[in-house]
């Protein structure tokens, strides 16, 4: 019997996606990454078919003995590499993690301070997203465009005047660390809590190239497990013994999560172990690559944000492309050449420019995991120039991109090349390519 046409279509689309994004494109989306083959193999396990509500050893379902083991082990590993005391892996995304924290810290009508939207605040921090859904007022802290950061003195004054229930630091356009130490004591002085959204920089924190906000005064930290931390898509919440964490942990189930997608757990554990042994070298290479790419783009005539500050201290690079037609046009043009980035608001844009902002946001973390280094960042900058400035035929540039990727198809910073793993491997679990 031949396969139904519908099934053939599903398999064709899946294969096309895997071939395209795994072997033919420069993946420079700042919020994405790639798991190791080992992490992917344990991701595709029986856990994906199972349910487990509640906390380990206190479940509402039977048949969870191995779920309890893997969840407990994964939390221990995550606390170890994060240098934290508390971890909850049940949020299924960073936004769900934020929602649980925000709901505990404030009631409808209460106030929260955030960074401006156009300066990098994630949509979940705003009235357009999770805060709005919870009925919490968002007030934007003053922002220093020259230093691409929260204006500390003005923010302190606002904290003292507004007396919010909580303050959120961290963001989705995040070139430089927010002033956690500088604001923490002032936040606490008015009885508020400091929430740090480390979704984008969690892997950098673990790699010890970004200051740990829990050690700098943050009460609680939310993360994604699939950006600079190269694990499965999901979220987590950490604290260093905060009472807030206990309250939040009680609300995740049943308010925000029922079953928490158990197949994430072994893949997250594998990634945590990879980061334990390879995280520092990976994070350091990410920073070298982002700096190299920013400098190479600037040398070729692009307006790279943050020149006076060294361009970036994270995995991200931000480029103003207004003179070439704006972020929307240029992101699409680059995609035609198999270079994948996203359009992004820049600090001096208006919130209403979100559909066609001035900028591009570029992230180097995924191509770094494929083994690219500073030399390849020079090549990538040259490809940007060919597409955007030189206006070369995008199909010709696409050929160059595909040729470049042929040398960077294997995930690095992992144990996958060790023969000891062969007894655990299963060819049936490999991606369809």
From Swiss-Prot:
HAMAP family for this protein? SHMT
For the keyword Phosphoprotein, the answer is: no
Q: Which cysteines are joined by disulfide bonds?
A: none
One GO cellular-component annotation of the UniProt record comes to: cytoplasm
One Gene Ontology BP term is: tetrahydrofolate metabolic process
- Name the encoding gene, please: glyA
NCBIfam families in the record, alphabetically? Answer: PRK00011.1
Q: Tell me, what controls this protein's activity?
A: Is completely inhibited by addition of NaCNBH(3) in vitro; this reagent is a known inhibitor of PLP enzymes, that reduces the internal aldimine of PLP to the catalytically inactive and stable secondary amine. Is also inhibited by L-cysteine, which forms a thiazolidine complex with the active site PLP.
Q: Which residues carry this modification: N6-(pyridoxal phosphate)lysine?
A: 227
Required cofactor names: pyridoxal 5'-phosphate
Protein name (record) = Serine hydroxymethyltransferase
Functional summary from the UniProt entry: Catalyzes the reversible interconversion of serine and glycine with the modified folate sulfopterin serving as the one-carbon carrier. Cannot use tetrahydrofolate (THF or H4PteGlu) as the pteridine substrate. Also exhibits a pteridine-independent aldolase activity toward beta-hydroxyamino acids, producing glycine and aldehydes, via a retro-aldol mechanism. Thus, is able to catalyze the cleavage of both allo-threonine and beta-phenylserine.
**Cellular localisation:** Cytoplasm
Site feature Plays an important role in substrate specificity, where: 226
Ligand binding ((6S)-5,6,7,8-tetrahydrofolate): 121-123, 243
Signal peptide boundaries? none
The protein's matches in Pfam families, at most eight in alphabetical order, are given as: SHMT (PF00464)
What CDD domains would the database entry show? Answer: SHMT
Keyword vocabulary terms for this entry = Amino-acid biosynthesis, Cytoplasm, One-carbon metabolism, Pyridoxal phosphate, Transferase
Q: Which reaction does it catalyse?
A: 5,10-methylenetetrahydrosulfopterin + glycine + H2O = tetrahydrosulfopterin + L-serine
Can you tell which superkingdom this protein's organism belongs to?
A: Archaea
Question: What subunit structure does UniProt give?
Answer: Homodimer.
A Gene Ontology molecular-function term?
glycine hydroxymethyltransferase activity
What SUPFAM superfamilies does its record include? PLP-dependent transferases (SSF53383)
Q: Report the main location listed first in the record.
A: cytoplasm
Pathway listed: Amino-acid biosynthesis; glycine biosynthesis; glycine from L-serine: step 1/1
The top of its lineage is: Archaea, Thermoproteota, Thermoprotei, Sulfolobales, Sulfolobaceae
EC number(s) reported in the record = 2.1.2.-
